[in-house]
């Protein structure tokens, strides 16, 4: 078709055709439809819940909250994470398909917050358990700050390369020292003798002398009645 005879047609064609790469198209589709898994445990999550309302309306960013980690590509942690909750959080993260992203929301999630000063069971930073892409400080952060964190994550996704996106994410994430979990069987004996903590997991593997040694617990005699 002769473009000289149809100048208007040629002008419309240039304005309606977009040339791009498959990598950019893939990044655009992922950043425009993030499906978050909401892992909220404290007051920070209340601030995130306000985004669902009509004032902020996070649906315009393509965010669709999911209840299953297998359908989510973004996990948003908000609130205090304890040592007892840590294995569940790691399990949820491992069940998410690649590529996946993490936003740490609030001081308690990032550093442990005020609960980490005198608590032995508080995880001092969720990045000790799972890699974090965006840190969102605040106590609690405002809904506008959450939108800003999502915008920064979208910009990060748009710059990802197509060669190996999974390794690219892992190389560009911040890690700190991981917690070491020693799984043991607790015994409520009434005193500080916890010798069964690191014994074999099955009682059948113990010798009879070892079992009877910790089985016999001497309680002080008392005549007081407890109401």
Curated annotation (Swiss-Prot):
Statement: the UniProt record of this protein carries the keyword 4Fe-4S: yes
Residue numbers binding [4Fe-4S] cluster: 43-44, 108, 139
Chief location bin: plastid
UniProt subunit comment: NDH is composed of at least 16 different subunits, 5 of which are encoded in the nucleus.
Annotated catalysed reactions: a plastoquinone + NADH + (n+1) H(+)(in) = a plastoquinol + NAD(+) + n H(+)(out); a plastoquinone + NADPH + (n+1) H(+)(in) = a plastoquinol + NADP(+) + n H(+)(out)
Topology of the protein relative to the lipid bilayer: Peripheral membrane protein
Family: Belongs to the complex I 20 kDa subunit family.
UniProt cofactor note: Binds 1 [4Fe-4S] cluster.
Subcellular location: Plastid, Chloroplast thylakoid membrane
Domain of life: Eukaryota
One GO-annotated biological process of the protein: aerobic respiration
Protein name listed in UniProt: NAD(P)H-quinone oxidoreductase subunit K, chloroplastic
Entry EC number(s): 7.1.1.-
């Amino acid at each position: 078709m002769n473009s000289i005879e149809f100048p208007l047609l040629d002008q419309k064609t240039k304005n309606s055709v977009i040339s791009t790469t498959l990598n950019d198209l893939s990044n655009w589709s992922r950043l425009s439809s993030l499906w978050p898994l909401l892992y909220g445990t404290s007051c920070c999550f209340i601030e995130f819940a306000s985004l669902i309302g009509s004032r902020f309306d996070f649906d315009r960013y393509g965010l669709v909250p999911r209840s299953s980690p297998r359908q989510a590509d973004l996990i948003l942690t908000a609130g205090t994470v304890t040592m007892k909750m840590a294995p569940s959080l790691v399990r949820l993260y491992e069940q998410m398909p690649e590529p996946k992203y993490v936003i740490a929301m609030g001081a308690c999630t990032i550093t442990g917050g005020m609960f980490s000063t005198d608590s032995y069971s508080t995880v001092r930073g969720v990045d000790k358990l799972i890699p974090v892409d965006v840190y969102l400080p605040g106590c609690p952060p405002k809904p506008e700050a959450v939108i800003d964190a999502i915008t920064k994550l979208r910009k990060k996704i748009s710059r990802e390369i197509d060669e190996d996106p999974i390794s690219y994410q892992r190389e560009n994430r911040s890690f700190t020292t991981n917690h070491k979990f020693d799984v043991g069987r607790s015994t409520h004996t009434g005193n500080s003798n916890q010798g069964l903590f690191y014994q074999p997991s099955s009682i059948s593997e113990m010798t009879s002398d070892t079992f009877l040694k910790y089985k016999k617990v001497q309680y002080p005699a008392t005549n007081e009645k407890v109401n």
